[in-house]
Amino acid sequence: MNTKHLLLIIPFLTLFCACSDDADDEKYASRPPVFEEIVCQPLNAGETVLRAGQPFVVTARQKSLGRLLNNTTYTWSDSEGQLSHKFTQKVIYDQETQNPTDTVVAPSAGAYKLTMYARYNASGNTSWWSGKHGSNFQSSLTDGGKATYVTGGLFYFGVTLEKTIMVGN
């Protein structure tokens, strides 16, 4: 190997070796937020019951905030596709860590299965979270719903929350 090739290889090896120790360091770890519950609140003052035809706000409450996350996409839906949804679709999570919300109107009384899917692009490494929780992790929400956390390789976390709600007349 001549000197010219050696001079090109040394900087790359130095960079590679310098970064390899950080892969499992918690301070460089991206983490998704951990959710505790999905709460529904009527928009009409004084109301406590969700009613058909009346708007209400659905909030996914975080138990702990995420960390080192950038582009984030939220999608709210219901299993029957009957609810009217209005929500913020994209945020930069580290700048906007508020709880995700959806304003919903149900056309009729009944049970509706709500789903929120969030994709959090990681700006740090995801291996710390995967090493601690696995690449597919489920937990129960305090309100009877469920949360599923999936690590998308080195690049993102996917979080799915599900809960059935009751809407009255």
What are these regions (language model features)?
Residues 1-19:
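Sec-dependent bacterial lipoprotein signal peptides
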Residues 3, 22-24, 44, 149:
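Generic preference for well-ordered secondary structure
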Residues 13-41:
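Bacterial Sec-dependent N-terminal signal peptides
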Residues 30-169:
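First exposed extracellular module after export/assembly in secreted or surface-exposed proteins
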